[in-house]
Amino acid sequence: MSRRMVAVLAVILAVLCGASAFVWLHAGGQSKTVVHFTPDPPTANDASSTSRAAPAGKSSPTPPMDSKSSANAAPQPGFMPVTGEVLEFTASVAKVSNVASLRLLVNGRKQIAGKDAWHLQAFAHTQNPLRMVFELDDQFDSYSVPGDFASVQYEMHLSERGQKVQSVERLTATGREPAPAGVSAARVLPGTRDPLGMMQYLRSVDWATTPLVHGPVYDGRKLYEIRARKTGSAEVQVPAGKFSTSTVDVKVFDNGVEMNDAHFTLYVAKDEARTPVLLEAVLPFAAARVELRKKQ
């Protein structure tokens, strides 16, 4: 696998699932995972949006959201991350399995910048044979407020091919809050989430009543918009077991323009914890999968 491929996987992964997913959420390959997908029936909104199609020759890079979409849909009643939860994933690219491992942790709640916040963590490591050419050991820390999981502080502690990078950023929508020593300020839109907070937010959504959500995501380098739509249900078999899931199509927009060269599908279990069990990515150079291996 080329360094360029790994770099692209890392960037996309950060946008989607939590900075620490920097390599994993897109490192899923074609393993023994089995998916039996059932699409949702067309909705009235889908039909009406088709009838309102733009005239020929005209297009909009950012189509309007339908009436059921929400940038900050309320979390499902009773949903709350479980302190101490550990999710372990294995990533594959093309026909090469287990190129990387990813651990997502819920490390309780802490006070930061005067706010109560969830401390979410992710640890990513490349595995052999990829590790022989691209050694990567990254850690990501997110401090996200309960409820909508908007980010307060986002940290990247990267070790890639012998080069180490430490980044600690305090997110601000006004630019008026001074960052403490050793911390940089990142100006973002109100309600911006980091990748780890976005993953928890997608888990909190009641997909039965809110089939489409969207909002800004800051990956530690750049601001994107994420749009996630429920497209159906699926029975999914991954190393951790068999799950009934909601199938969520995820699109990434850069400055209002969809990144059409990549397509992502997230499978969220229909259990009380709304566990993310599988992420599929179709990229220009390969298909990737990140599969749940173990849940603690």
Annotated model-derived regions:
Residues 1-16:
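N-terminal Sec-pathway targeting helices
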Residues 4-5, 18-171, 207-296:
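Acidic, serine/threonine-rich low-complexity disordered tracts
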Residues 162-204:
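Hydrophobic, well-structured mid-protein blocks that either form specific transmembrane helices
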